Amino acid sequence: MEDVDLGKDRTQLIDFVYANGNGSASNLNNRNNIPLSEKAAKEPLQTQPQEAPPAPKPKVQKQKPPVKPKKRIACSPGSAICLFLLAVAAIIFAAFLGHYLTKQNYEMMQFKSANESMTTCKNFTRSHKKHQDIVNEEDADENASIKQPTKEELALPKNVQPVWYDVSLSPKVGGNGTMGLAHVKLNIEEPTNKIVLNAKDIEFTRNLEKIQLSKEVTKRAKKSVDSGTNSTSEMPEGSGEEAMATTATTTTTESTTPVSSFVDTGIKVTNIEFDENLEKVTLTLDQELKKGSTVVLKIPFTSKVSNNNGLKEYKYKNSEGKEQSMFTTQPSYSYLRHVFPSFDQEAFKAPAAITLMHSKGSIVVANTGVKTKDDGDAQTSTLNKVLDPDFVIGDLVASEVNTTSGITIRIWTRPEVKHSTEQSLDYANQAIDAMEHILQSRLESKSLDIVAVPGFQTGNRVSPSFIVLPEEDILYNEQSNDINQKTRIARMISNRIAAQWFGGITNPEEFGTFWLNEALPRFLEVEALEKILDINSDDLWTYEMEKILERDATATSQPLRVKNVFSSADIAEIDHEFIGKKGAAVLRMIQKSVGVNVFNKAIRSFVSSYRSAYPYDDGLWKSFEKALGGKLKGWNNEPLDVAKFVNTWVDQIGFPLVSVEKLDDETVELSQERFKNDHKTKEQFKFRNAKYWFNWEVPLFLKSSGPVGNVSWLHEAFRLPLNTSDSIYLNTDSNGVYRVNYEEKRWNDIAKQLEKSHGKLSERTRARLISDVFALANSGALPFETALNVTSYLPMETATVPWLIATRIFKKLTERLEGAPIQDKLNSFIYQKIHKKFEEISSSPGEASSNYLKNRLYANLLDLMAIVKPEKSNEKLNELFVEGFLAPCQFSGNFSSDCSEVPGDLREKVYCNGVEFGNDTVFETVRELAEKEVDGAEKDLLQNSLACFRDPRALRRLILDNLNSTSTVTLLLRKMNSRPVGKEIATNWIIDNWSTVLKKKFKNDPETLNAIADAGIILDNEREKSMIETFMEHHHKSTHGIESLDKKIEEATTDIYWRKQKINELNDYLDGKMKGPAKDDEMESSEEQE
């Protein structure tokens, strides 16, 4: 059946099969019963026999009346001339009337346009239409060639320089756009008759008279001042700095205050052109602006609020079920051009003062000072000048706490969830204390505002003293949440607070240099987590290193330092999360190589002396050289050059596989090569010829039972003295970002040692051995028998980290072999390994509920038990769902976070299982509870459980209904792909709706398309892989740059190849046909026979 392509009939078949399980088949059948019309029901069918018709009666012929002679109508010449003149007069009158009405209509349109209409400005120079062949595709523009703009094309001309912005904005609820008016003061550096600004998704007026150029005139108004001591606030114009209080003693005098006014220059705008690709708007003037002059540009506009960069509206429902909105700037790269027309490039930075018109009762929180006045039915808030304005408008209230260093932390939330911020305040307080201790530095500001926005999508920008986070990453409910939510809050807050010390990326061109802006907060968040929740950072890194290594072993991986990034399309291709996590792992490897004390000393020196240096990362490596003082030697026995060491890890993709090969009884050789999951997919051309030819400077972290000398680094292959009786281990405690391979015999010896005395190796070393041996077996470098033998000792393992790695590997095996003939054998094998550990953790749930890593292990074991023993798992989960959720919540009218009695760490699985095996009534109950829930974490759990339902039609509606929230729809798609029915729906829905829904809605947002494709597409076989490849060919323009699609194809290629190569080998092992590790005497006898 796998090779049969059912096309659209396949989707209908899925609908019919799964809908029956929910009692919905009747609806489907009723739709197919189309009643006959009354006429069709009464008339007999033509094929039925009929009686012969009666014979016709003879017709009686009637006599025809005599034909009358025709009358001729005559017209005199005079009458004809009169008729002709009347016709001419009618034509002239009709022409005059048409002209008059057209003129009136045109003048009315001009009047409306001048006063209220705003239209998208396009290039008025239109190309002539040419004949084009009909394209047999859904979108004709898919055939257009893909051309990325160059750096020079994207750059703004330097003949005009902004001094300041004064912008008024009036956001409208419901995605109706933001009406705005911008005043921009400009210095003219070179003579020009054009002004070029950045603009994206902004509409301009056609009434060019509304766009004005003025001169700023400063007048002085007199003001009386009494003698005495006066306090004033001074702010240098255009500086963007905070006001500085000054005190002076004066006598009674008259002081003067400068007041600015604007006088029209008489220069007119004759044309306005918009270039969508370059994100520029060009104003053409009727006169040339002179060098050295200063003008103020006034331009009205309307900006969108529905995109994912710039100003965005987030909708939610309050506790009474009323829909409300919050508006917030979306802090990402080059975002000002989405809010108002601006010179949105690093070389043209200028402070902006923002005036916001908003509804009465709402609050404005910003990264600068805010003054609000009441205008009756509305309010006006004015933001002080700042380089990168960042703000939130909404119904907000604050909770606050003061740190020991005197910083006031305020967390702003909706009024109905204010009580759930106590935990976040405490974690923010501890995070600042932890950062101040690690960095030996304090924040420059004495206040920090953290705003919680429902459904917010976290960006990469950092605003001083101002943080915006998703509400679900802030709120904690003691009754409904668990250790996972505590960890989620602590990590997110620690990450964003750490970023306050290091700044953020404000311009695409900086990304190549500023990779550390992602990595440093990631690294420090784990350090802070150890202080806040007592989570061992080394254990956590060992577990989380798995995803980093798996991703980096693919052909679609990316280097940490990405250069030549100029546009938003380039940025969309960058995997920010991966770069941040791998970068943090590299920083940890540096820490383990140089020592904690030296590392902290270097970081502190960087914060105090080099943080503002450019290039940014050069300052950090100088700090390390200073802290090391030439004491640590590198691979060449010279003082370690930290910059060169790190460059080998950040300028090329992937990581090394260090191989240990025994040459004879007294010598081993160490060598390195790039490790890949397989070699079926090629890297992007620009990454194939790596800068260092896939050679790294590798810290070995070596442990040996015999003398091997002072060995710390691997650069080129070299040999070590090692006797046969001695053992050697590399990358102990999982400190390095690489894998290690030993000879097959050595792996078998390791398996025996683990069975005999696994405690002699640290738990992180044991975890790294399990991870490496399975990665090597999956890649074909080792037999799978060798990897499975290493797990023989697992029933005796008591530590958490090795089990975390093993359960993750077992789960991946079950996913790859789902539906395969050996699935039952594999399930029995895994059950024998895990059932004792599962019973052990289940018997003491209190420990798992308070320890994050043990809680993760419990979750992994529950997932595995649901696969290998589904009947036992489902019965228990269903019982919890009925008794702990439906019974107390279904008719109570309460919020789920208040009425649910299901333990917090089990809610995700219990809710999903209950919805999956429930009926339509259960689905609607959970949907209604999710809709009115005010607790962010509980709302997520309820919404995601809806994706477990088994009615395909309901799942499709669920995706469509949640497209306005990228974070929600991606979570739903991931959850669907974890269930058998949802997996059949998600990928097909994306393909079917790419042109009609997704591409249109997210036309200028490739990052969101990338996230949706990554979450929603799962490819399990050749047919599905071929389907996506064909889809990408037909939509090559809109899928260009969606790197998650290439990643999915590579993953599918790897899995398909793996199944072809490994199923027989695994079958033989599970059947007991393999002997296991060979003994020394057996190997010697086999060699003699050869």
Curated annotation (Swiss-Prot):
Parts of the chain that traverse the membrane: 78-98
GO terms under cellular component: cytoplasm; extracellular space; membrane
Stretches of the chain found on the membrane's Lumenal side: 99-1090
Keywords attached to this entry: Glycoprotein, Membrane, Signal-anchor, Transmembrane, Transmembrane helix
Membrane topology category: Single-pass type II membrane protein
Basic residues bias (residue ranges): 59-71
Cytoplasmic side: 1-77
Residue ranges, compositional bias (Acidic residues): 1081-1090
Record InterPro entries: Aminopeptidase_N-like_N, Aminopeptidase_N-like_N_sf, ERAP1-like_C_dom, Peptidase_M1_aminopeptidases, Peptidase_M1_dom, Peptidase_M4/M1_CTD_sf
Subcellular location, record wording: Membrane
Cross-referenced Gene3D superfamilies: 1.25.50.20, 2.60.40.1910, Neutral Protease Domain 2 (1.10.390.10), tricorn interacting facor f3 domain (2.60.40.1730)
Region (Disordered): 21-71, 217-259, 1069-1090
PANTHER family: AMINOPEPTIDASE-LIKE PROTEIN AC3.5 (PTHR11533:SF201), PROTEASE M1 ZINC METALLOPROTEASE (PTHR11533)
Protein name: Aminopeptidase-like protein AC3.5
